[in-house]
Amino acid sequence: MALPNGISSKQELLEAQAHVWNHIYSYINSMSLKCAIQLGIPDAIHKHGNPITLSQLADALNINKAKSHGLFRLMRILVHSGFFDKVKVKVKVEGEDEEEEEDAYSLTPASRLLLRSEPLSVAPFALAMSDPVYTETWHHLSEWFRNDAVAAFDTKYGMTFPEYAVADDRLNVLFNEAMACDAGFVNSILTTECREIFDGLESMVDVGGGTGATAKGIAAAFPGMECTVLDLPNVVGGLKGSENLSFVSGDMFDFIPHADAIFMKFILHDWNDEECVKILKKCKEAISRSNNSCRKIILVEIVMEDEKETHEATETKLFFDMQMLAIITGKERSEKEWGKLFFDAGFTNYKITRVLGLRSVIEVFP
């Protein structure tokens, strides 16, 4: 066998081929996961209460009996991907007194995060990010590199993602549900392990806070703090507040309500550096009228290039960064890049707390 230049052995060639094939077909992992959520596989196993056999699972999901082998193959790849465990259970043989062993499936920590009843469920996020509106954009990435569009999304749809989301009610709902489900996870940590971040604050504005899922959790945890959600009219129009929570419609590039603190979760990564500096300057204006010595900006964002993280964590951050490249004008940033933005916007100091897994809490001080 003639080996390509730079490959020294047949084994190296075969390993290289397997590596390439693995990446060619890696989208199948995402689509298999999406299928599992749409079929309700995690919920069916959870409802069963014990490890569930293939036939029991097929019955619970009302699967076409002619396609039970397809369900077996779907479960096989999902077990391999770590979403389910396969165990042996004893089942009674029909018409006999004997029992025999059969394969059965149980939940893993990953699939428990896909349960509809789980407060920290990421199922809505998974369904949104695997929606064709997002995935079809990737077929235009190479074209985008050679044209003048701001993102591959614009190349595909002829408009920016925010413009598309405003015009498409279905996508708007999907996106807001995805952001709301993530809020449960963030709130569970912010309001327990990071309570000191909110010490001394009497008012806070959640900029780009969507339907208020994050702000509601913070407002409930800190009843003495006035919380305001600022977002576009198509997002917050018609939403009603409660005791210490209110909604304001508007564009953060035009104005941000005054407060002791400005909170932004996964907002700045949507924008390029110039736009981020503009947003941060608006935030600085919003807290400048406060006499509170604790005034600051609170960000929940990814910080790239963390030498202590795992290979999988780095890869996931790179996925997020490429998503920003394809869909909008933003990016994920290193600590050095974050620091430059803060200082360019007139802030004097910042503090990064790595407490949210892939993301960090960043406090920015005037």
From Swiss-Prot:
GO molecular-function term, one example from the UniProt record: protein dimerization activity
A Pfam family recorded for this sequence: Dimerisation
Active-site residues from the entry: H269
Enzyme class: transferase
Protein EC: 2.1.1.88, 2.1.1.-
Pathway as given in its UniProt record: Flavonoid metabolism
GO biological process, one term: methylation
InterPro entries cross-referenced by the UniProt entry: COMT-like (IPR016461), O_MeTrfase_dom (IPR001077), Plant_O-MeTrfase_dimerisation (IPR012967), SAM-dependent_MTases_sf (IPR029063), WH-like_DNA-bd_sf (IPR036388), WH_DNA-bd_sf (IPR036390)
This protein's UniProt keywords: Methyltransferase, S-adenosyl-L-methionine, Transferase
Catalytic reaction list: 3,3',4',5,7,8-hexahydroxyflavone + S-adenosyl-L-methionine = 3,3',4',5,7-pentahydroxy-8-methoxyflavone + S-adenosyl-L-homocysteine + H(+); 4',7,8-trihydroxyflavone + S-adenosyl-L-methionine = 4',7-dihydroxy-8-methoxyflavone + S-adenosyl-L-homocysteine + H(+); 8-hydroxy-7-methoxyflavone + S-adenosyl-L-methionine = 7,8-dimethoxyflavone + S-adenosyl-L-homocysteine + H(+)
Positions contributing to S-adenosyl-L-methionine binding: V207, G208, G209, G210, D231, L232, D251, M252, K265
PANTHER family given in the database record: O-METHYLTRANSFERASE
Family: Belongs to the class I-like SAM-binding methyltransferase superfamily. Cation-independent O-methyltransferase family. COMT subfamily.
Function of the protein: Flavonoid 8-O-methyltransferase involved in the biosynthesis of polymethoxylated flavonoids natural products such as pebrellin, aroma compounds which contribute to the flavor of peppermint, and exhibit pharmacological activities such as anti-allergic, anti-oxidant, antibacterial, anti-proliferative, and anti-inflammatory effects. Catalyzes S-adenosylmethionine-dependent regioselective 8-O-methylation of flavonoids; active on various hydroxylated flavonoid substrates, including 7,8,3'4'-tetrahydroxy-flavone, 7,8,4'-trihydroxy-flavone and 8-hydroxy-flavone 7-methyl ether.
Subunit structure: Homodimer.
Protein name per Swiss-Prot or TrEMBL: 8-hydroxyquercetin 8-O-methyltransferase
Originating species: Mentha piperita
Gene behind the chain: OMT2
